[in-house]
């Protein structure tokens, strides 16, 4: 069963990163990829994972795109998770998010600690 969480992933030419990110949020009931006219196959990757692609004409920095998405998209879920395309939700974190959402307590927001990992090219 999918977890009632809406995921927003703002992108522009993120084909290199997007597949891994989308694989990590397959548990979420809806995923929105907010694109700014990518030319590298980003939208095709999003479609492969059945994410809804929404175009946003890029006219500013990431905060503007994020705020536009939060104000414009009609979410079906009370919980929203914002991710960059180069971020992934680890399996343990996905389980914790699902538990919090299913509990339905009075908490309205969470801070998720991040772990930074770097890979060498080649």
Model-assigned labels for residue ranges:
Residues 57-64, 70:
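A short, glycine-/small-residue-rich helix N-cap motif at loop->alpha-helix starts
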Residues 67-79:
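Active-site nucleotide-sugar/metal-binding loop of Leloir-type enzymes
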Residues 24, 35-45:
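A conserved acidic beta->alpha catalytic loop
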